[in-house]
Amino acid sequence: MQKNILIIGAGIAGCSLAHFLANSGWNVTLLESEDGIAQGGSGNPVAAIYPKFMLNDEAYNDFMLKSFRFTTAWIRRLGLNEVDYRFDGAIEILEEAYAQKLEINLSRKITKKENFFSLINESILNKYLIECNSSGLFFHQGGWVNPIALCSHLINHSNIKIVTHQKIKSIEKSIDQWTLKTESQKTFNSSHVAICNASSVNQFDLTQHLHTDAFRGQINWINSTSFQMPPIVTCDEGYLAPLIQDKHVFGATYAMNDFNKDLRKSDTKKNIASIKKIHREFYNHCEAQKSIHGRVAWRASTKDRKPYVGRVFDNQLLGKMRVRELARFGSRGFTFAPYCSYVLTNLINDNLSQEDKKTLNYTNPERYRLKKMSLKKVASQVFRV
């Protein structure tokens, strides 16, 4: 029996899910509203991949750690061209007291921590050309990936069909299948649907209750410089990427529910200011430029920073929840989305591990609705672990 699924959205979430499903025997139709894949928040020249931990949120840190370890190991195995990814390390600059507290917390959680992270010291600063008075953490497996190269690689499969210029207007349920209608009056039918279109997911009746905020993000870049630059991803108030495709990318600004598509000089100035503590010479170089390239895109996020991964309730057919949600990854999309796509594939294939169930309980898309129904405990225990 053929297994067919429609996936709405061809960013990192949709492409990752298509990849895992196709490799497990599904025929996937990937529907994208733009003229190509990875055109939204997944379309920047580089995506930094490193774990962003919280000081007092153990559940979030567990999820972050699982996602980061899965994604970096998985990308290494994919067979991407060597110029399209690198995991030589990443530095997160933090206040010294905060870094020390975080180091203590992570040391309890991570075995063989010396292989995973280190407190920044003088030798690390010298090696990676960072300002000498900095403090923070060095993540040994952190790095970056070329987003478009990764997404293109993921959908290069005979079971995946890509259909662009398809802006989905509605999702409707008949007796045994879902019907997706586009603004151009086309229809697509399938027994299974996955919604992976970031902040646009609220447009559907089925998912309009899922809270989301759209964040406008602007990045900038400068072409290669004549002086030495840090060879790894370095993050402070903003991030600075190493030379990739003859560009040093840095940023990013974030503005909630701001839908201005134009590059802003004020945001460029903010991005330049955000790298001042990382590399003073590069900061001065950027300050002296008359014009700097950039890009604007939107990311979706939730109130609690947790993505939506799992089943969406069908109000009329609660027993047949064959619509899945995979969205709202915020700025951590390339860290979270591959792992969450893998877990969602296991849900669709009815092949969940105990760890998968823990993740789906944590990312349950219906958590806010269940809490409003005084079912807070149920929201985090949809799957028995």
Give residue ranges: language-model regions.
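Helical element adjacent to the flavin cofactor pocket in flavoenzyme catalytic cores
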Residues: 137-184, 188, 192, 196-197
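Conserved beta-strand positions in the Rossmann-like core of class I SAM-dependent methyltransferases
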Residues: 29
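Short beta-strand to alpha-helix junction loop
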Residues: 56-67, 95-99, 137-153, 262-267, ...
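C-terminal catalytic lobe of FAD-dependent flavoproteins
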Residues: 286-385
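Dinucleotide-binding Rossmann-like beta1-alpha1 core, especially the glycine-rich loop
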Residues: 46-128
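Extreme N-terminal leader/targeting segments of oxidoreductases
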Residues: 1-5
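Helix-loop-beta segment of a Rossmann-like dinucleotide-binding subdomain
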Residues: 55, 81-92, 118-155, 253-257, ...
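Active-site substrate-recognition segment that forms the wall
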Residues: 6, 13-24, 33, 41-53, ...
